[in-house]
Amino acid sequence: MSAVLDTPVAVRRTAMDLLARREHGRVELTRKLRQRGAPDELIEPALDRLAEEGLLSEARYLESFIRYRSNAGYGPARIREELGQRGLDRGDIDQSLRESEVDWAARLEEVWQRKFAGQRPQDPRSRAQQTRFLAYRGFSMEMIGRLLSGRDLYD
């Protein structure tokens, strides 16, 4: 049976339980608390206090999400879109992607090697297939073109 979220203490405890599992953005945490029946007038003060105490951090959430999704084989465009759908500021997303220490070229090559076993496309159809897959994963057409044509990704 779920707890009734009708007091500031109950809302804070539930928010902290969610944050203990993994980082959350403010919008995502608000949505989850609403789904659990917490009223808006209790959610905002609780989240403000958690942010003041450093327990709720958009920067940490962005960093964690970028690391998690890039390790899963996704590129910057896909990650940017997913974070935008989660209600985060585009400027903050772009800054976090720039500051992340992800080597996108190496990540692209890993994903390509894993999916296509390092086999460069021999015909237009297989090139289109590989391009579609890598673009869907969120890598830029420029990087994909360099990889598939055998050019250096770091130029």
UniProtKB/Swiss-Prot annotation:
Keywords: Cytoplasm
Subcellular location, record wording: Cytoplasm
GO biological process terms on file: regulation of DNA repair
Gene3D superfamilies the record matches: Winged helix-like DNA-binding domain superfamily/Winged helix DNA-binding domain
InterPro entries referenced in this protein's UniProt entry, alphabetically: RecX_HTH_1st, RecX_HTH_2nd, RecX_HTH_3rd, Regulatory_RecX, WH-like_DNA-bd_sf
Principal place of residence: cytoplasm
Pfam families from the UniProt entry: RecX_HTH1, RecX_HTH2, RecX_HTH3
UniProt keyword Aminoacyl-tRNA synthetase present: no
Domain of life: Bacteria
Cellular component, GO, one term: cytoplasm
Annotated family: Belongs to the RecX family.
UniProt function note: Modulates RecA activity.
NCBIfam families documented for this protein: PRK00117.2-1
Protein name: Regulatory protein RecX
Organism: Pseudomonas entomophila (strain L48)
